[in-house]
Amino acid sequence: VTLGRVQVTDFRSLHSAILQLDPVFTLITGPNASGKTSVLESIYLLGRGRSFRTRRLDHLIRHGAERFVVFGEVDAGGRRIPVGVEGSADGIRAKIAGERPASLAELAIALPVQIIDPEIHRLIEEGPSQRRRFLDWGVFHVEQSFVSDWQRYQQVLRQRNAALKARQPRSVVSVWDADLIQYGLRLTEARSRYVELLVAAAAPIAQHLLGLSLELGYRAGWSKDRALPEALDLSWSHDQEAGATQVGPHRAELAIRLEGSPVKDRISRGQQKLLAASLLIGQVKLFPEAGVQPTLLLDDPAAELDDQRLAGLIGEVANQTVQLIVTTLHGEFAAFGNPGRRFVLEQGELQAL
């Protein structure tokens, strides 16, 4: 799967931009605040249905416009599949091959896209939900049945939480327990399998970039000394008090250790970035084994990295089987080879070179 033509209209500072992307390597250069990150953000939106920078939809619409439109043509085994996303005051609307998808997960099937940007340290620094989202996106592409189990679990969880919030008796709340347990265990098993694959892929990268041994573990979201049915039963009083379900895979955590010690608050910002990059590149590394070629967006890789660390990061990215789209202030990166397509962006105007 590769992304070919992309057309962006009224997205952030971009009034109108058209890119014909190279299937291997596209380079976008330009000064700071020229809109380079916005181009990557629009491509990310095509594959995710959301921004990696903001939850505020109105921030994505160019000042004075009523909506933005991002359109792309995906080449999937010789078939061209049009994919489009439109955002307005009414929300996000997507189309794949002219049809409205049943869920935004279908965008991820049509265009698997991941990003490494200057904010990737948030994957390490912020709370467990960031890491659950990272895990689930990876599991979905390795085990595509995962998304239906995830959606069903979320539906059951919402219904159970609504009953708890409404102070319904235990006999009413427990109606949802069997499905919560069934789908919760499926998610847990799939995530656990994926973490084993991920650490095998990411540990050598972390060793190269950080010079430290990486270990990953999966904490299921309830005590490891109990089965989920027992944990759910014992949590009843806590659930009542909180008005929400307190155990289950929605409370899971990806445990990360370097040299045997938890990483939280123990490593520098630069190390956080390289650790997060190791996980993201490790995730991308697993895609070809599942028969998928992802699009990898690399935004300003030189930001806050010294020459040695930058060379290591670029070398690891260059080893992956991806469609690569890179933004930078100027220049090229020899490890990637010559870009098949190159664009320069200045003051919101994009030109092919």
Where are these regions (language model features)?
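Hydrophobic "anchor" residues on beta-strands that sit immediately upstream
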Residues: 18, 93, 113, 295-296
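Walker B catalytic acidic pair
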Residues: 299-301
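Conserved lysine of the Walker
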Residues: 36
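Nucleotide-state sensing region of NTPase/ATPase domains
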Residues: 44-130, 136-146, 196-204, 214, ...
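Long, charged N-terminal accessory/stalk domains
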Residues: 122-123, 129-174, 178
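Conserved NTPase motor "head" modules and their coupling/switch loops across ABC/AAA+ ATPases, GTPases
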Residues: 1-31, 45, 170-182, 186-295, ...
